[in-house]
């Protein structure tokens, strides 16, 4: 493994401005998308009962755990036997509403609250569970460099690596996330957000 140090391309002032902009945009989005969020919650409640929000522990800035929020897309106790890396086509664990939400990435809406709170940024590496981080670290210990920055809702790696359903894909995602870490800027973030929105509008699954 290469003995290279990976550093955040943003300086302290840029990081503070990025966090401030994320906070303002998240506040506006929480208000603007509240009717859509309520509609999603009602649809989940009618089909499969409560809870409508699913929370899961992920690892974020400085390696600290936090709870990520999503609209529940799977049946209750879908992972009672433990985490499952492989997402099966036509996954029977998904509810009908959940499948629709995932297809249009609406299950991610509650993560606006994570951005508002400061757990996450609008753009950054996707946060992972410790269960999978431990497995990744066995193959590539560079993962800890990602702890320098807040995880994001969309990421550079998601655009070009798709759903990470195998360990080779997870390792490729790590390499892409490290590239983002070393090159991130407001302009880079804007391009990632734009490409993500285009993919969502055209129904691309990633």
How should these model regions be labeled?
Residues 1-6:
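Hydrophobic transmembrane alpha-helix segments characteristic of membrane transport
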Residues 8, 12-13, 142-206:
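C-terminal terminal-structure detector
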Residues 9-77, 114, 186-206:
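A hydrophobic, helix-centered structural microdomain
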Residues 22, 107-108, 177, 189:
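Acidic active-site catalytic centers that drive phospho-/nucleotidyl reactions
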Residues 26, 41, 54, 95-99, ...:
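Positions in alpha-helical segments
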Residues 54-93, 154-173:
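Short, glycine-rich, amphipathic interfacial segments at transmembrane boundaries or analogous
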Residues 87-150, 193-196, 200:
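A short, structured surface patch at a secondary-structure boundary
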